[in-house]
Amino acid sequence: MQFGELAKVLAAVESTTQRTTMVKLLTSLFKKAKPEEIDKIVYFILGDLRPPWEGVELGVAEKLCIRAISKATGLSAAELEGWYKKSGDVGEVARRALAAGKRPTLLAFAQQKPLEVAEVYDTLLKVAKAAGEGAQDLKVSLLSSLFSRASPEEAKYIARFVVGKLRLGVADMTLIEALSEAFGVSKEGLERAYHVYPDLGRLARHVAEGRPLEEIKITPGVPVLPMLAQRLSSASEILAKLGGTAICEYKYDGERAQIHLREGSVKIFSRRLEDITHAYPDVAKAVKEAVKAREAILEGEIVAVDPDTGEMLPFQELMHRKRKHDVAEAMEAYPAVLYLFDLLYVDGEDLTTQPLIYRRLRLSEVVEEGGDVYIAKWGMFDGAEDVDLFFHEAVSLGTEGLICKSPTSTYEMGARGWNWIKYKRDYRSEMIDTVDLVVVGAFHGRGKRAGLYGAFLLAAYDPSTDMFYTVCKVGSGFTDADLRRMYDMLQPLKIPHRHPRVVSKMQPDVWFVPQVVIEVIGAEITLSPLHTCCIGAVKPGVGLAIRFPRFTGRYRTDKRPEDATTTKELVEMYQRQKKVPTT
């Protein structure tokens, strides 16, 4: 496929505000693609070269990209940087430069072979792999070779891709729906395969080649989508939901981790499927010593501890571990302990279809506790008073509360169901709990906040429609540093119109691709005619909103937008808070 054909589809996807139109455009594109190029097309649409756990990054900032455009067009870098300062879009700079800069003669241009998708992808992969002395010059040379042969529209999307600002915001589920339509494959089957092996490029090629989805199995070294929990505010409600008996585990305030042991090496993946092994070499070493298996996939929580007292520290302390440099110093200042709570695979045996009580038994057989690896404290209960006692014990020891699970439940990858239920201490507040919401828009700041965003439009996620619905406008709780950080985080996501996956009655000054997730608390959840969250769920024509929302200071960089608080959860929180007596 010629890259120009892909660029036309990207332009159409970018301009639409209708998700159904987006699916139709992608379906048509996939039908035309060859099996050997469809994976590259999918990766490009997602803005990635490879799946997240492989950690392949282009390492190209705007200035380097502008150097490449300058080399290809003969326009000065200074002039191009001036254009960039005005537009803020390196893609627009590339489009304009290719339209205005020196071009081949008409004859030479006619004889020039059009760019192919595979050629663009392979060149970008070379850019990503360029390292060591002279790497920057090599990156510029490779990129300029693409720009010199690209049309203005092609150059726009190549430039945006290389700086990580493609701005399409196409969701994984949208791509799955389009693949299902294009190849006549069950959408549910594709979703199941994606949960087991969440590499959409590989999945697209698999179905394009006509291979059965049953071939895709859980594989050590490839993270699966984690199972997620619902929430309730009382032990009696939790037990009723779980059929009268629950396995309750401490809910540690740390970083959820999926640990893969394979051929003597350990990989640690975040809930966003990124390889974070570099941040926890001590944990990886401890896993090798503690896990008595050749191959295994385990789940747990990495918790920071005080090196002097051994007491658990808040989740935020683990952020010191994320720096690529000074890891040794961070390990000493912020030691970490791993608390394991599930075993998904061991030595050729897929345990995800086995009941939790069996997985727990196998976990205790496989793990030799000690050092920095432990099994999360748990118990099995059938009485609300016993659950509450265990809950208070957990909170007093510095945890967030409990995760209560059905003893007979299988491991449902990527699902948020009622087999796992959170019971957290935050449920004692009026609003019952904090919520994690997605930033979809912003309002310009005034006075001290001039030049930045003064407030943000936040939305909850509805997995049944794959859409985001607004629930509040928040401007409280942000420090000056927070406002600057939010501005810098959101600028690359700025788009000229409401995103097709966002439903909003409010009109902010600026719209964004839904990607940034932040934690918010409020006084209560109220009925609102201004917001679209859960319209009609409680009262006809009226949605839900958070009253007096406030940013807690916690950026949920560990969560994808699809991991945000759901609209269904907000309805349940609204209904439960009615039972809390006011004082």
UniProtKB/Swiss-Prot annotation:
Protein name: DNA ligase
MF terms in GO: ATP binding; DNA binding; DNA ligase (ATP) activity; metal ion binding
CDD domains, alphabetized: Adenylation_DNA_ligase_Arch_LigB (cd07901), OBF_DNA_ligase_I (cd07969)
UniProt function note: DNA ligase that seals nicks in double-stranded DNA during DNA replication, DNA recombination and DNA repair.
Active site: 251
Species classification: Archaea, Thermoproteota, Thermoprotei, Thermoproteales, Thermoproteaceae
Residues that bind ATP: 249, 256, 271, 301, 341, 416, 422
Enzyme Commission code(s) on record: 6.5.1.1
GO biological process, one term: cell division
CC cofactor: Mg(2+)
Keywords: ATP-binding, Cell cycle, Cell division, DNA damage, DNA recombination, DNA repair, DNA replication, Ligase, Magnesium, Metal-binding, Nucleotide-binding
Catalytic reaction equation(s): ATP + (deoxyribonucleotide)n-3'-hydroxyl + 5'-phospho-(deoxyribonucleotide)m = (deoxyribonucleotide)n+m + AMP + diphosphate
Family as reported in the entry's similarity comment: Belongs to the ATP-dependent DNA ligase family.
Gene name, Swiss-Prot/TrEMBL: lig
Alphabetical list of NCBIfam families matching this protein: dnl1
